[in-house]
């Protein structure tokens, strides 16, 4: 059986630790990264940003993903944006491999890599490596997909609970992608996914881990949750006014796309897709989108607050936001 190799983190004594800007959705990560890149340009340095966001990899997901504008991408070099069609799947393992290679390539050009984003599974894979889970088996996956369509994913979730109750307990019954993957792993290896993850060569990959010394983590953590939620509500309403509905209509016009694809399951896109399918009305779509966005932010903060060694700043405090930028400037080179 072939497995994806454990990805060793970069540890080079020739360079300072890599800056990584993280935070919950709506915390201002992109703004901080762009300010840092513009400062670097003003002193003759070049920062290249590596996106750590599972939605930004997809072409056509622009408005709902808060993708950096064409002007921003023209001003500062961005990587791992618009690299896939929404029919494709991008994994944490692939991100870890791509980010590692990009950091090496950027430094070989004499430039400075800065990783920015909030997809914490990508963070875990890049910072701590991955357990040796088997790669996808197309035959098994296709059969499980057919079973899921026939029996329904809640029934498949029940099946998973019988062989891997620990994994089933943390997955929603309709999370077809992850339920399918857990069943696939069991069929390939004969072991529950939870058992394989427990055998990971790096326990540091779990929540509560110490940040590796080759990363300088800047974490934007808003202290005012109510203000964050209001900002997220305002941003989503601006997305709706800015054409999110039309963007999802365009995606739906592609017959190769469906609601179970990872791209379409992205927060906001899934809810608008359901609305266009007639499953919800406008108010329910908006409510579900905002609830999903808040839940995403809560999960991101849970990940971050469990980490020791991070450099934390409140983006809603002007003095702390300035301190965050100053910290990044000091740690560029």
From Swiss-Prot:
Chain's role: Catalyzes the transfer of a dimethylallyl group onto the adenine at position 37 in tRNAs that read codons beginning with uridine, leading to the formation of N6-(dimethylallyl)adenosine (i(6)A).
Region spans: Interaction with substrate tRNA: 53-56, 177-181
Annotated protein name in UniProt: tRNA dimethylallyltransferase
Keyword annotations of the record: ATP-binding, Magnesium, Nucleotide-binding, Transferase, tRNA processing
Record site: Interaction with substrate tRNA: 119, 141
Family, similarity comment: Belongs to the IPP transferase family.
The protein's required cofactors: Mg(2+)
Domain of life (superkingdom): Bacteria
